[in-house]
Design a protein with these regions (language model features):
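N-terminal secretory signal peptides that target proteins for export/translocation
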Residues: 1-9
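Bacterial N-terminal signal peptides
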Residues: 12-23
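Sec/Tat signal peptide C-region and signal peptidase I cleavage site
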Residues: 24-28
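Sequence context surrounding c-type heme c attachment/ligation sites in exported
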Residues: 29-151
Length: 151
């Protein structure tokens, strides 16, 4: 089959349309604000975000198992005020906080403080109250990830 026959074939048209449809979302402009961070800070932040996602999953798993106080302890240790500043001893180029736009950094701080609020409620052992607090915590995550990107 010649190149001209391939280009004129229905298979080629279907392939081209499929390729265009699959790549269109990737080519669409991302409306989130780009936070320009040094590569080392990007890696630090991405590693931290993956860890926090795992922690949120563990917290939800603990709540399902009615281990509410344990969920609160984990939230405070891994996400709360206790987790703030853990990158302070790293070289500047690896520290995401000081390189973030001010509003993005403030959302991060709000996330830590909201995790501490969740932990305080969970310390009571009242699962319903803890579950009622959880959307506030996850809502801060959603707000930041919906507003900012690092690539």
């Amino acid at each position: 089959m010649s190149l001209q026959q391939i280009l004129n074939s229905r298979s080629w048209v279907l392939f081209a349309l499929t390729a265009a449809l699959l790549t269109a979302p990737a080519l669409a402009e991302d409306p989130r604000q780009l936070a320009t961070l040094e590569p080392a800070a990007q890696e630090t932040l991405r590693t931290e975000m993956r860890g926090q996602l795992i922690t949120l999953n563990r917290i939800i798993t603990l709540l399902v198992a009615n281990q509410v106080q344990e969920a609160g302890e984990m939230a405070e240790k891994e996400l709360g005020r206790s987790a703030m500043g853990k990158h302070a001893r790293q070289p500047f180029e690896a520290r995401p906080g000081p390189q973030m736009p001010r509003e993005m950094h403030q959302l991060g701080i709000t996330g830590h403080l909201t995790a501490t609020d969740f932990a305080r409620v969970a310390a009571s052992g009242d699962r319903e109250k803890a579950l009622a607090e959880l959307p506030k915590l996850i809502g801060v995550c959603v707000a930041c990830h919906s507003s900012y990107r690092i690539r």
